[in-house]
Amino acid sequence: MPSTSLPYTQMAFHMPLKELQPVDTSLPEHIIKGAVVIDKELTTWNRRAVIPSTALHTVFITINRLEQKQADVVKMAAREMNLPEDNTYGLMADAPKRFITNENIDQLGSGFILTLCASPDNYVKRITEILEDGKNIAQMENAVKTLDEFSLDPALIEAFYRCSSLELLFDLVRDDRVSMSYTLLSTCLRALSSILELAVGDVTWKSVPRDVVVSIAALVTGKAKREEVNTLLAALAMIEQLVIGDDTTRDWVLEEVPIETLIRHVEKSDERIALAALSLMNSMIRHCSDKDKRLELIESLEVVPFRNAVHSSLLRDGSARDPKALEQLVEVQRSLISAYDTSPASDSEIQKVLDIDSANENSEEDVEIWRTKLAEHRCGRLATVAMVLFGEKSPQDLRMLISENTMRIEGGKWQLIPMWMRCCDITAELFGLLPGRDELDRLISIIFSTDSPFPAVFSCIVHLFHRTWREMQAKGGEMDKVASFVLEQLRHVLKRKEIHDVEEMSADLETFSYKAMQEVRREEQLEKENDQLHSEAVISLKAKLRPKIEELVRINHLNYLKKGDVFRKPMKSKSLAKAAYWFWKLDASEKMLTITACDGERFVDDGHRDDIRQVWLKDVADVTNNDEIDRKASSSRFASSPSTNMLRGVRVQLKPTNDLKEGEVLMALTPDETQAGIWQESLAYLVGNTEMRSKTNAIVERMLKMELRVRLLNVKLADPENEPDVPPIPDDLISFISSF
């Protein structure tokens, strides 16, 4: 009997398919694989270590981070490399350079490359031997360099405190021989600074002894025999940390480093040194708790050499403005401004100001009001001094201002003393003396260019105020309005470009008129509105409003077609025959187009016309445009000049009939592009062609913008330049919360 079994291949083909499940071959998270290499300098830092000839210089190992500690991994690596296990080894990672410990072994990931090296204790012992010997400068430089490389590694620093002492580095700073080697000294200072900043154990900046502070201070005050850039940078940075770190070390620094000795570093060609010196100045002033000492430090910077040093290095013409330097200069200037005398003005100082305006016929009541306001002015003596200086140094300008003011009609004049006080308020706000947004970062070059910056800027503002008052045609009660506009003008001029001195500022203000500022306002308002229109909320609102606006425009256009328009018929030849016209009108049912011949540009419906044609829109195949040139010289509205004129055409293609296989074409011409566009797009919409709607879309977009801008008029948006007012925390916070 023949076998009925199928061949194997056919059986396999007809067997049901079995889905294979994916197999995860990745290692668990706590299992990592990587490589270990032998450090080439292993025997340098551990002289007892021996690398046998059978040692493997690179091995691959697997670490179980849950079960294995650092010591276990070191032993495993040494065993895999055929190294003697009686030596003490360590594992080192690069970028950043650090020793592997039980605390950071969890940070390793698969693919690591570690270096089997000497242990941290061996490193410290060898460094200590070299530094204590002190004979080979090259070896000392290499030892300190290694310490600097590991100065941010707690493992080596702990070993350093365990096997050596920080006094070893302090001795290097004290040693005059070390100061002759710039590389050794600068590296030592950097390493010492990093170790103190790391603050392992109780060793911090307050651990620095006074004689070391004196030695470091000598490097920046000019007492050192020689100066080098890297050493100077390291010393300046260390002194600043000593100022910040502890009250005792701060007092030592203030005694050993007079702030005026730092001025010479500001004019260095290396801007890093100038920046470090400025940063140290600011820290000395900022952290000085003694008010008298702080005022003394500030007054030491109110000198011409300091201003010249800043101008020659950090504010020189043509140099790029470093943001970090600008930040330091602004802080210096804030300190200088804080020392301005804003105490209440004396009676004699107030009388000097009033005497300047004594030539004008002012009532005794006004004079007494001004006297009181000057005595209570927030800028005090600073304001009265600026006013008196304006009268004494610019008497001709003052006479000119008063003369122009007296020629104005009654009610359109400003009063000198109130105007001066308002200009002082503006100047004080720009300088940060009064609440508001200061402009010190933009005024910095101007302030450092003059001995008396406040009176100089005040003088510019007085002239600007007078000119703006005239251009605005302001009246007596509009002092605040003009002042607000003047402040806005100043901010815009300062923002527009970098100004170097008072003369340049005055010239720029002369060219920036009231009308120019109005134009800027309009541009900013338009830009603000455009930004609002592109926000997500407005875009969402725009999408919701669009269908209603489109429907409104469509109905409006159809109503326009129902009123009807006169069009010119296309000319069959280029002869000078009289132009022919016809009147097109959409039926109220929006299903039929009525075309009536007419004699001229105006259509009069007398009700007795026989030449009326009715075209059903269902018989229209397509509506397109077809422009042509009008070469007729006519005085009608279709040709206002003898020159050629472009006529916009509305081309209506009817469906084919038995008589006309291609369908009849009706053409209507007009010089009015808007009229042609409305007819063409509206008829196209009625016959089912919704693609050609450029004119309609433009009108829809314009109406949408108008609608959105009207809606945004009453929406108050937060000003990004002004911080919102945050109310204080209530005294009884629990009852405040429970009330809700």
UniProtKB/Swiss-Prot annotation:
GO biological process: actin cytoskeleton organization; actin filament organization; apoptotic process; cell migration; cell motility; cytoskeletal rearrangement involved in phagocytosis, engulfment; engulfment of apoptotic cell; gonad morphogenesis
Residue numbers covered by motif SH3-binding: 724-727
Cellular component aspect of the GO annotation: cytoplasm; plasma membrane
Keywords (A to Z) from UniProt: Apoptosis, Cytoplasm, Phagocytosis, SH3-binding
Highest taxon listed in the record's lineage: Eukaryota
Subunit text: Interacts with psr-1. Forms a ternary complex with ced-2 and ced-5.
Protein name (Swiss-Prot/TrEMBL): Cell death abnormality protein 12
Native source organism of the sequence: Caenorhabditis briggsae
